[in-house]
């Protein structure tokens, strides 16, 4: 501010002297002064280093004032030599006009000084095209010089302005933008200003968001946009803010190399280009790195979720396989128990048939006893007598029991009950066959599933398919069918045991379903009568034995079915 004041005073006084000289003489002296003034201003414009040599004191300004006064006095003396009265009159007029002009100039300078201080203008009394004066009045002189250097770098035709084609060439050639730079170029040419001067570029830089960046924002830009995070600590150490980016943009060797200590030329060039971009065209554009990071994170999360889902499905499949294996083992045990029980039932039935056959043979032999020849041995006669005695005793006991009960079943009831038992046995056999088929199909499905699980593709398909659920459901259905067959067989044994106990008839041991159908529906009276007679005669003799056999069979069957039920429920 003090330098501006000195130069204002000097220029005003110099103008006053020129005006005074012009009033005295309009000859060659005026042309000489004007040419000297033009040469001085032209020298200031051509030599930008003059701005750095303007650190003069108030005494240098005063000496310049004295030298100019002596020059004016010398001119007045030269004119005074031309003679007498006219010289005295000119000297008085010169003294009076110089004093008036000097007073007016001083008052105008003071008013301009106060007006420039009040308005806060950055360039004060500098001319619009006087960059040296303008850079000398700003605080960030290095930043201003860097902005001017960038302006010269963009101004290809050296006309003092940056037009649209020059900025377009700079974006394409220097910053290597192939596309997507229209917004940044539009932001550079603010308000469609197609000709940008140094002053406008400096004012745009002062308004820029990048100019107000803090140290943290600058280091973030260095790490993310420039991708040189190794210099973050160095920037923090030297407190590099956004205002220092123009010096980085012009690749100031003193600042970048000596102050910051960055020696790698490739890194210097990279920092310079990125700094040019943000200084001239604003904050860096989105390069898509963040979106790539989002997509990468999303894909990573999807992969993790997919792996977790596959792991869960594999674990569930293994758990289903273990459960199916357990169910199959339970079904196998139930099947074995059922087969053993069926074998025991068949064995008991064969024993009952053998007993009945022996009884019939004994009765036949008793009937044929009178016709035996006397040649039979005494031993056989004794045995027959013993058997006859036993039969008589049992017959008498049965008659006694019938007399005590005072009720005897009808003759045909035994045949109908035997026929009913055979029908139930036939239906039970059908259900058992169906349950065995379900068991066999479940076993085959389980084997197929195990074969599929042996390969990777089959394991993936079986994991994501419905085959496991279908096999599991078929196993459960087979187990339920076996349970129903077991319960029904247990209930039948108990029920027919109670019926035989109450009636004293042999129902379980019979001559078979075809014979019973022939007897009951064939209308053969002889067979029916003989069946009735044999039943009345033999029933009393077989009541005790059949009851005891049914007791043993029911107890054994009950134990077997209890074991089978426990295996089936497992």
Swiss-Prot record:
Residues 24-294 are extracellular. It comes from Drosophila melanogaster. It is found in: Cell membrane. SUPFAM superfamilies: SAM/Pointed domain. The keyword Signal applies. It comes from the Eukaryota. PANTHER family: STROMAL INTERACTION MOLECULE HOMOLOG (PTHR15136:SF5). Plays a role in mediating Ca(2+) influx following depletion of intracellular Ca(2+) stores. The gene is Stim. Residues 1-23 form the signal peptide. This is Stromal interaction molecule homolog.
């Amino acid at each position: 501010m003090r330098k501006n004041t000195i130069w204002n005073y000097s220029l005003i006084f110099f103008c006053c002297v020129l005006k005074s000289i012009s009033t005295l003489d309009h000859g060659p002296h005026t042309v000489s002064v004007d040419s000297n003034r033009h040469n001085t201003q032209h020298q200031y414009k051509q030599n930008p280093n003059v701005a750095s040599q303007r650190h003069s004191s108030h005494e240098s300004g005063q000496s310049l004032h004295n030298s100019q006064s002596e020059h004016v006095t010398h001119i007045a003396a030269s004119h005074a030599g031309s003679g007498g009265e006219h010289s005295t009159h000119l000297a008085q007029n010169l003294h009076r006009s110089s004093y008036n002009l000097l007073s007016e100039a001083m008052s105008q300078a003071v008013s301009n000084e106060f007006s420039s201080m009040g308005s806060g203008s950055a360039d004060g009394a500098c001319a619009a095209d006087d960059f040296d004066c303008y850079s000398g009045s700003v605080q960030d002189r290095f930043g201003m010089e860097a902005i001017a250097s960038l302006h010269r770098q963009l101004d290809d035709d050296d006309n003092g302005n940056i037009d649209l084609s020059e900025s377009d060439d700079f974006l394409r050639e220097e910053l290597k933008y192939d596309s997507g730079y229209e917004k940044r170029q539009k932001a550079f040419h603010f308000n469609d200003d197609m000709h940008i001067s140094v002053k406008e570029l400096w004012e745009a830089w002062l308004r820029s968001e990048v100019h107000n960046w803090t140290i943290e924002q600058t280091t973030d830009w260095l790490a993310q946009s420039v991708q040189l995070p190794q210099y973050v600590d160095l920037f923090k150490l030297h407190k590099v803010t956004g205002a220092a980016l123009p010096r980085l943009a012009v690749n100031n060797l003193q600042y970048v190399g000596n102050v910051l200590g960055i020696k790698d030329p490739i890194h210097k060039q990279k920092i310079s280009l990125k700094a040019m971009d943000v200084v001239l065209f604003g904050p860096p554009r989105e390069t898509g790195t963040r979106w790539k990071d989002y997509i990468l994170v999303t894909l990573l999360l999807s992969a993790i979720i997919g792996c977790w889902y596959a792991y869960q499905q594999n674990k569930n499949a293994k758990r289903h396989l273990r459960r199916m294996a357990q169910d199959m083992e339970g079904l196998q045990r139930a099947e074995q128990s059922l087969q053993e029980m069926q074998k025991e039932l068949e064995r008991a039935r064969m024993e009952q048939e053998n007993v009945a056959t022996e009884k019939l043979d004994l009765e036949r032999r008793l009937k044929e006893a009178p016709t035996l020849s006397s040649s039979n041995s005494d031993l056989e006669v004794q045995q027959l007598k013993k058997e006859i005695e036993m039969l008589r005793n049992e017959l008498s006991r049965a008659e006694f029991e019938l007399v005590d009960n005072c009720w005897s079943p009808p003759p045909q009831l035994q045949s109908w009950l035997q026929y009913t038992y055979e029908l139930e046995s036939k239906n039970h056999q059908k259900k058992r066959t169906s349950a065995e088929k379900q068991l066999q199909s479940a076993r085959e499905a389980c084997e197929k599933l195990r074969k599929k699980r042996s390969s990777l593709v089959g394991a993936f398909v079986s994991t994501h398919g419905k085959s496991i659920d279908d096999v599991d459901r078929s196993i459960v259905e087979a187990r339920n069918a076996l349970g129903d067959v077991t319960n029904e067989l247990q209930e039948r044994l108990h029920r027919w045991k109670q019926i035989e106990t109450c009636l004293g008839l042999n129902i379980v041991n019979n001559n078979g379903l075809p014979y019973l159908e022939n007897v009951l529906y064939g209308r053969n009276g002889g067979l029916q009568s003989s069946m009735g007679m044999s039943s009345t005669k033999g029933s009393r003799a077989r009541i005790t034995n059949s009851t005891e056999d049914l007791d043993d069979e029911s107890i054994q069957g009950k134990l077997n079915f209890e074991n089978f039920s426990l295996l089936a429920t497992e």
